[in-house]
Design a protein with these regions (language model features):
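Catalytic machinery of carbohydrate-active enzymes
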Residues: 1-320
C-alpha cells in the first residue's frame, strides 16, 4: 500500500468530530492527503465536505480487533501506510496498540477538554496540535483565534435566503428545548414571510410524530439518516435553529447563520463555531450542569427561562 500523509482516528459522535474540522482543514492544507477512521455516516460526511480524501468505517469488524490480541492484517496495513497518525482518544491502551503496529509518528489528543477547563473544544484541539508541532500558531499577530480563522460560507450559490431549517433534537433529551417552543418559533417565522423546514434524525422520529400530530404549523418535514444528505440540504438554507447538538455544529460549520439554544451544557466549550452564530441561554447559577452529571431539575429550569420570543429575536438578528 502506498504511503500517505495523515490518518485521523476519532471514535466520537457528530458534534465531537465536526469540532475538529477547522483543525483538519489546516492539517490537510499543510500536509496534503488525509484519511479518517470514524463512524461510517461521519466519514461519508467528511468526504462530502472535502475535509478528508478517504475514510474507513470504525464499526467494521476489522477495527474491533484493535482491542484484541490478534489485529486484522488489513488494519495493520492501513495504519502502516500513513506517515502521521492523530488519535483523538482518552485511551492509553489504544495508543499503545497503535504504537506496536506503526513505526511512524503517533499523537494522542483528548477529544474534549477536561472538566473545569474553560476552553472551546475546537480551540482545545488546535492548541494541542500546536503543542505537538503539527501546526504553527500562525495568527498570533492578528489576534484572531485559530479556531475562527478558517470559517467561511460553504453553502450552495443557489441557497434560499428565506428558508430556515429547524432541528429540535440532540444527542441527549436533557439538552432539548421543548418541541412546542420550536413550533411557536416556526409559526412566527412563517408569519414574517419566511419558509420553515424541520429536520429529524432516526433517534428523533418520536419528536417528528409530535410535530405532525400537533397540526399547529404547516412546514416541510425531513426524516434523514444520512449525514451527507443532511449537509446537502443545509447548504440550501438561509438560516438554522437548533439545540446544543451535532447538527447545530454542522450547520454553523457550513456557514448558515445559526441560533443554538443552550440549557444545561456550557457554550464556552460547545458553542457551534461558524461565521454567524448566536447562543440563546439564560444566566443561571446552576448552569452548566450537564457535563458534571448533576442535572437535577425535573423540568430543567434553564429551558423554562428561554422563550420563543428570545429565539425568534436571535434568528431575526442574524437573517433579518
Amino acid at each position: 500500500m502506498k504511503e500517505a500523509s495523515i490518518l485521523i482516528i476519532h471514535q466520537g459522535a457528530l458534534g465531537d468530530v465536526v469540532a475538529t474540522f477547522p483543525a483538519l482543514l489546516r492539517l490537510k492544507k499543510l500536509y496534503g492527503s488525509m484519511a479518517i477512521i470514524c463512524q461510517s455516516n461521519i466519514g461519508q460526511l467528511a468526504r462530502e465536505l472535502d475535509i478528508v480524501d478517504n475514510w474507513f468505517p470504525l464499526e467494521a469488524a476489522a477495527f474491533a480487533t484493535l482491542y484484541s490480541g490478534q489485529i486484522d492484517p488489513i488494519v495493520k496495513d492501513i495504519l502502516r501506510s500513513y506517515r502521521k497518525i492523530i488519535l483523538f482518544s482518552r485511551s492509553h491502551l489504544l495508543e499503545k496498540t497503535i504504537y506496536s503496529i506503526s513505526e511512524h509518528d503517533i499523537y494522542r489528543i483528548q477529544p474534549r477538554p477536561d472538566l473545569g477547563q474553560k476552553i472551546h473544544v475546537t480551540q482545545h484541539i488546535l492548541s494541542n496540535l500546536v503543542r505537538h508541532r503539527l501546526l504553527e500558531k500562525s495568527n498570533k499577530d492578528t489576534g484572531i483565534p485559530l479556531s475562527l480563522s478558517i470559517h467561511g460560507d460553504r453553502r450552495s450559490p443557489q441557497y434560499d435566503p428565506l428558508k430556515i431549517m429547524i432541528h429540535p433534537g440532540s444527542g441527549s433529551r436533557k439538552k432539548c428545548w421543548p418541541i412546542s417552543n420550536f413550533v411557536k418559533v416556526a409559526s412566527s417565522i412563517k408569519a414574517n414571510g419566511k419558509k420553515v423546514e424541520f429536520i429529524f434524525g432516526p433517534a428523533e422520529y418520536d419528536l417528528c410524530d409530535i410535530l405532525l400530530n400537533s397540526k399547529r404549523v404547516s412546514a416541510k418535514v425531513h426524516r434523514l439518516d444520512k449525514l451527507k444528505e443532511l449537509a446537502k440540504m443545509l447548504k440550501t438554507a438561509g438560516g438554522f435553529i437548533g439545540n446544543d447538538s451535532g447538527v447545530s455544529h454542522l450547520a454553523a460549520f457550513i456557514g448558515l447563520p445559526t441560533v443554538a439554544v443552550f440549557g444545561p451544557s456550557d457554550p464556552k466549550t460547545w458553542q457551534p463555531m461558524g461565521r454567524a452564530v448566536t447562543v440563546v441561554r439564560p444566566d443561571l447559577e446552576c448552569s452548566p450542569c450537564f457535563e458534571t452529571g448533576t442535572v437535577g431539575c425535573e423540568e430543567i429550569e434553564c429551558f423554562g427561562r428561554i422563550f420563543p420570543e428570545d429565539v425568534l429575536a436571535a434568528i431575526c438578528g442574524l437573517v433579518g
